[in-house]
Amino acid sequence: LAWHEMTCASPAYLEQYGEPRTPQELAGHRCLLNSHYSGREEWLYHQRHELLRVRVSGPFASNHYNLLKKAALVGAGIARLPSYVLHSELADGRLRWLLRDYQTRSMPMYLVHSYQGGLPKRTQVLADYLMDWFRRSGEALDRL
């Protein structure tokens, strides 16, 4: 399983400031920064084997995905967030997926547990649930 970062903004933000058509245009926008990462002011995109590095800035930084999502929902700026936190807002139109033609970072996910001769039933149930949830979440994004 893996998740990838998605660039998004609210329709209200896009109406007021316009929609960036290329990653380079993000330099002129209000971006919501993820302080969880070092180098948060540089967003990376890939297209046709070319790496694009964009310096961004904005009014707000947080290491909490839900705060960044809420800031994007109220029109404070453009956010880059993990796909798994955005599927319902993208599906119902409260956020719009930007720069879809450009690839962003993809992160694998692992479930790590100790091995002592077998996986406890409760751990297996949790693993099955998470695998199914992330699979369905990815399928929902593919339909957008």
Give names to the regions the model predicted.
Residues L67-K69, L86:
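Short, hydrophobic alpha-helical packing/hinge segments within bilobed ligand-binding/sensory domains
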Residues Q24, K69-K70, Q124:
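Alpha-helical segments flanking ligand/cofactor-binding loops in enzyme cores
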